A protein has these predicted regions:
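Edge beta-strand at a domain terminus
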Residues: 109, 117-131
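Structural motif
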Residues: 33, 106-108
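Beta-strand residues in well-ordered beta-sheet regions across diverse protein folds
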Residues: 40, 113-115
Length: 131
């Protein structure tokens, strides 16, 4: 993988940010295998966060599983001809809900716009590249 492609790709290590406090919430590692992008929580960064926190709001097999190591992003693929990845899902472990997701690298790949939506409602977070 070329350095330029790596920078304009969601693949890498990212810090998700608390939108209200502008402080890091979690570190997420995004990988790609067979054209499909997946993101897992590596660490919880919020001040006072329990590193052994469980996803108490999650449903099904994720209920009460550790948040660290959990897959948040799944099934995402690159849109042909665009620097956009979509078609997958993102989990919010704080409320246990899953959303459709679109990932768009911006600022020369140093930031990642993570847009989650349910129907006509959406929210965009900006994550910061760590690596």
């Amino acid at each position: 993988m070329s350095a330029a492609w790596a920078q304009m790709s969601p693949v890498g290590t990212w810090r998700s940010m608390d939108e209200k406090e502008n402080t890091p919430k979690a570190q997420v590692k995004i990988t790609e295998a067979g054209g499909v992008v997946t993101g897992k929580v590596e660490a919880l960064l919020r001040k006072g966060a329990d590193p052994n926190a469980l996803c108490t709001e999650c449903k099904d097999e994720l209920k009460d599983k550790p948040v660290v190591g959990m897959t948040l992003i799944s099934g995402v693929k690159k849109v042909e001809g665009k620097e956009v990845w979509e078609g997958g899902r993102i989990l919010d472990p704080e409320n246990g809900k899953t959303y459709t997701v679109r990932l768009t690298p911006v600022d020369a790949g140093q930031k990642l716009e993570v847009r989650g939506s349910i129907g006509p409602f959406w929210r965009t977070q900006t994550w910061i590249r760590v690596q």
